[in-house]
Every structure is written in C-alpha cells, then in structure tokens.
Amino acid sequence: MTGDGPPLLIFNGIGASAGLLRPLMLRLNVTCITFDLPGVGASRPSLVPRRMRHLARLAAQVLDTLGIRECHVMGVSWGGGLAQQFARQYPRRTQRLILAATSTGQVMVPPRPSVILRMATPLRYLSAGHFVNIAGEIYGGDFRHDAARVKEHARHMTPPSITGYLGQLYTLTGWTSLFWLHEIKAPALVMAGTDDPIIPMANARILAQRLPNGRLNTYDCGHLFILTRLDQVARDIDAFLDTRTV
C-alpha cells in the first residue's frame, strides 16, 4: 500500500509481482493497494485452483481487512479481467474502473499464434536471456529496439511459481466478460498501446464500446506502455480519478 489520497486497488498481469508496478504507484496521487496473488511474488501457491469470482472475493477480503468500503479499481493485462470481475461482483464497492492493456477474456481478438505460445509458459520470468530474446516480439513498442530498457525490466522481474502461473492460466480458462460488460455502470477508462502483440488494439475498442460509461485512451507504444509512457499514463489516471470530473 503506497501514497495518499483515495484508494486505488490494482491487479497486475499474469505471473507479475506487485513490485513491477511500483514506478507507476509512486507517481499517482492516490493510495495504491495491491497484493501478490497465490503463487506470485511473495505469496504461496493455492492448493486449490481458483476461478475469477474466487479471486475477486479474495480482493474484497483484503479491502475488508484494511477497512476500505469503496475504491477505484485498476487491472493491467491479465489483471484487467479480474478488475472487470470485481466491478461486476462488487458494483457498490467500485467507484471508477481502469482497464489497461487488457481484453474481455477468452472471447477476444487473439494475438498471433507465436505470441500465444510464448505466453503459455513462465519461461520469460525464469530466464533473463530468454526474456531479452523474445521481449520485442511479445511486448512490442519500445521493447522492439531499446535493449537497455529490456534488460532493466528483466532485472526487476520476480519469477512466479510454476503452480501459480498455471493457476492463473486456469483462472482465465473459459472466462469472458463480453456478455455482461454492459452491466458495469462505473465510469471506465480503457487504456491501450497501439503496438501491442499480446492484446491487439481492437480489444480495447470493444471494451470501450461495451462499457456504458467507457472511454478509450491510446498510447504510441506496446503492451507495457504503463511503464514506457509512465508520465503520460500517470497524468491520465490522476485526471480520470479526479471525482470532480464526469
């Protein structure tokens, strides 16, 4: 938990520990709340695989422990699915919703098969050399040509457990928000990179169109624009979370 201001609950991408988003959290004018899901970062793997609704309930329990009744909710990549599930499951606890580099789940405009194969295993977290070799292909944007940025990102990654990574893949299996997105009434900001091999841009347009109070911001970068366009992203999030705006 970092910062001051209204609370923002953040869900990270598959296999990614909470610490990867620390640069963003330090820039925002809100109190950021995040935690490692089972099998990721400092959390032990769950003995029983969990579905999205179970993880949303876990997040609600975290808020209960902190004494927080309502908050803004943000999800990045895989975490965007969990953010959508939380907003549907706990509409009265969700003030505003931010969906970054994400989609409606398994019913989506898919990436290329080669990208799907790269994402099917946690090898990029386990081998820095492998990550450097494939980063441009799967993340796009600056990672296609900025070797120094790729190596710096690799240095900050914490490998998930195999069980934890496979558990997150299982959580997403068969899950989609496409048919109930219209039920989410909270103001929603959809953020997307124009060169995202993992989540093609069409998915962001679908999210923004299906959400009754959704709008779309795009960034001239790839899947990790949250970090590579940090200053602009932080400004846009702060502006959106200013509850004086409509």
Spans of model-derived segments:
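Active-site loop/oxyanion-hole signature of alpha/beta-hydrolase fold enzymes
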Residues: 34-74
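Flexible "cap/lid" loop of the alpha/beta hydrolase fold
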Residues: 84, 88, 94-124
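Gly/Ala-rich beta-loop-alpha elbow adjacent to hydrolase catalytic centers
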Residues: 75, 79, 83
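Conserved HGGG/HGGXW glycine-rich cap/lid loop of the alpha/beta-hydrolase fold
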Residues: 1-44
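Catalytic histidine-centered segment of alpha/beta-hydrolase-like enzymes
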Residues: 221-234
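Conserved alpha/beta-hydrolase catalytic His-Asp/Glu region
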Residues: 128-180
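Short beta-strand/loop motif that positions the catalytic acidic residue
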Residues: 184, 190-192, 196
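Conserved alpha/beta-hydrolase "acid-adjacent" motif
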Residues: 197-203
